[in-house]
Amino acid sequence: MQEMQARAQALISESALRSNLTALARQAGTQLLLPVKADAYGHGMEIVARLAARHPAVWGFAVAVPREAATLAALGLGKPILLLTPPTLEEMGPLADLGVRLPVASLAEAEALPAHARAHLKVDTGMNRLGARPEEAVRVGQRLAERGLLEGAYTHFATADEPDLSFARQQFARFQEVLAALPPVLAHAANGGGVLSFGPLPSLSLARPGLASYGFAPAHLRGVAPLTPVMTLQARVTHVHAVYPGESVSYGGLWRATRKTIVATVGIGYADGYPRNATGKACVLVRGECRPVLGRICMDQCMVDVTDLEVRVGDWVEVWGTDKITVTDVAAWGGTVEYEVLTGLGARVERVAAG
């Protein structure tokens, strides 16, 4: 059977990824534990991991769920993998067999770990999501050390991407108190906001910049390190036709032509992760020009005004990229954040490694 063409492609730039990793490692003063959870923030876990594994600053990878860990381990990239959220007791053995580092936050978990496991102590310093409170974390960490299983310890900053860093500093002080009561371990706390806000932090061996690795920073931290969006999203024109005065486009008739308009139907919609809430605000790049999306964004398609442009079926239009239209723009149009737009990118969008 002939291979079918993708209607939409996410081009993943190796050069942008490498540049971002270099800049963040320099800013942090440590190696990186690169988060590739949620399909590498929508960029494609396998593509990103294969590209990043060749970078000298990447110590290993962090994932959110056991299935991600198993998939990543099967690639055989030779880099450590840390599971960030707790597995069930039944999952501990198989994950340890794969060499996956396991999070531990209780004495019960510390006792249940198989003898060949490697553990990272999860400390809750104020996020109140996962982990042991500092006083309990010390006891858990000491027990893991007694068993010879303690490789690392980590916490997570709740507000490091905000201008006010006072709470993040409190969190880090609590984490340092825990580290002082343990033998030397691989310690990590700084997410992207932490890396950009604080730079090198004492006692830390690794940094975990997530969204920043893919080229995005909070508005007040842009420019601290040179970051470039790694993904360019493009979609094919599937139909070109004329619409005449008084005629409407898409569901609900929200947009109505006041003049003859040439409309291109483009093969991407909200089922692919293009936010429906961006209706009435979104535009795409057609031959380098920002052109408005007309009417409601549909499940599989959207319609674009291409009047006075030379456009044919099969042409690519840029949905977002590095210059005129970014994920930040699309997130603003959709009333959300870059994380949600990127991780919502659907499986129908083909991920392609690019230069």
Swiss-Prot record:
Residues engaged in binding substrate: R129, M299
Pathway(s) of this molecule: Amino-acid biosynthesis; D-alanine biosynthesis; D-alanine from L-alanine: step 1/1
Keyword Isomerase assigned: yes
PROSITE patterns attached to this UniProt entry: ALANINE_RACEMASE
Keyword Signal part of the UniProt annotation: no
Residues annotated as the enzyme's active site: K37 (proton acceptor), Y251 (proton acceptor)
A biological process from GO: D-alanine biosynthetic process
Modified sites of kind N6-(pyridoxal phosphate)lysine: K37
Xref: HAMAP family: Ala_racemase
Protein name listed in UniProt: Alanine racemase
Name of the encoding gene: alr
